């Protein structure tokens, strides 16, 4: 009898568990993780490593909801081409496990949750920026550029660069030059992150008529463009050190070391543009690059890191004259 009663509880039913998994998949959690890392880094730098735990967790939860909403709407719009591609045809919407109206309600609920969490847990500016991120991703990238321009990921990449603005605004209530440099870092990093992936699955994009750069302009051109954008990353990342002086020597060292590895891989890709394993290597490293760069920002912004750096500088300044 007891077993029968428990079996009738909806949330213990296997079908309910699968539905929860399907909704979770609509949000594209792997993408969300990268957004949250950049948001966290911005908050850490903006607060000099002293952000409050409540604000930190509230902002990250809201960011996850906003990104999940945008990704769900993207899945709704792209369900037709997802059905055609073998790689994506088993996703919740093209497979029919989730209906469009259900996904729409889910996306709206996530967006509203994100807005109110930020509006009441942080400030209105961060809430509006999160909504702007959704609007840019859906309006500019998904609806306008993805199926019409080879520059879709370049211009549409602005949406992925908004999370650090949200994090910065949540802490400070404003957007300084440093916040916009963080935006620029993500904006410039997006093409050399995404284009190698597009090179890996070029056949899929060609099959459904999506004009990604490798489909329209070829592998060699895409590899060259990847190299150029990777080249631009170093001077932009170092703007946080000079002239803005919001990050120090530890971050600069990490940024340079990571960039050397990144540009080396991007150069290798230009030499073998048809090598999909090389494209995969660049794609994977681009993720590691961003994660470690953000970690470097965070550690560099900690008070004790700054104290160690200033103390070491004073010792060095006192030591150099004694040598002379």
From Swiss-Prot:
Name of one Pfam family that matches: UbiA
Main location: membrane
GO BP, one annotated term: heme O biosynthetic process
Keyword Transmembrane helix: yes
Membrane topology of the entry: Multi-pass membrane protein
Taxonomic superkingdom: Bacteria
Regions crossing the membrane: 31-51, 56-76, 105-125, 126-146, 153-173, 181-201, 214-234, 238-258, 285-305
GO terms under cellular component: plasma membrane
Keywords noted in UniProt: Cell inner membrane, Cell membrane, Heme biosynthesis, Membrane, Transferase, Transmembrane, Transmembrane helix
Enzyme Commission number(s) from the entry: 2.5.1.141
Name assigned to this protein: Protoheme IX farnesyltransferase
């Amino acid at each position: 009898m007891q077993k029968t009663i428990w079996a009738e509880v909806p949330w213990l039913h296997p079908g309910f568990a699968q539905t929860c998994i399907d909704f979770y998949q609509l949000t594209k959690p792997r993408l969300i993780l990268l957004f949250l890392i950049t948001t966290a880094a911005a908050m850490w730098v903006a607060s000099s490593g002293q952000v409050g735990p409540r604000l930190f967790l509230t902002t990250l939860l809201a960011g996850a909801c906003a990104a999940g909403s945008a990704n769900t709407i993207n899945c709704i719009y792209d369900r037709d081409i997802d059905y055609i591609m073998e790689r994506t045809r088993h996703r919740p919407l093209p497979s029919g496990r989730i209906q469009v109206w259900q996904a729409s309600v889910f996306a709206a609920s996530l967006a509203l949750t994100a807005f109110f969490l930020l509006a009441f847990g942080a400030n209105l500016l961060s809430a509006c920026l999160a909504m702007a991120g959704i609007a840019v991703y859906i309006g500019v990238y998904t609806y306008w550029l993805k199926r019409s321009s080879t520059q879709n990921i370049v211009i549409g990449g602005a949406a992925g660069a908004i999370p650090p603005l949200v994090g910065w605004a949540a802490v400070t209530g404003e957007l300084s030059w440093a916040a916009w440099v963080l935006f620029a870092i993500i904006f410039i990093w997006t093409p050399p992150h995404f284009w190698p992936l597009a090179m890996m699955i070029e056949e899929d994009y060609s099959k459904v008529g999506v004009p990604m750069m490798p489909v329209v302009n070829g592998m060699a051109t895409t590899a060259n463009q990847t190299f150029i954008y990777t080249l631009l990353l170093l001077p932009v990342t170092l703007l946080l050190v000079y002239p803005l002086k919001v990050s120090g020597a530890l971050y600069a060292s990490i940024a340079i070391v990571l960039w050397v590895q990144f540009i080396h891989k991007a150069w290798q890709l230009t030499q073998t543009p048809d090598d999909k394993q090389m494209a995969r290597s660049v794609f994977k490293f681009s993720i590691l690059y961003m994660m470690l760069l953000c970690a470097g920002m965070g550690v560099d912004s900690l008070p004790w890191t700054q104290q160690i750096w200033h103390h070491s500088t004073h010792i060095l300044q006192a030591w150099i004259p004694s040598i002379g």
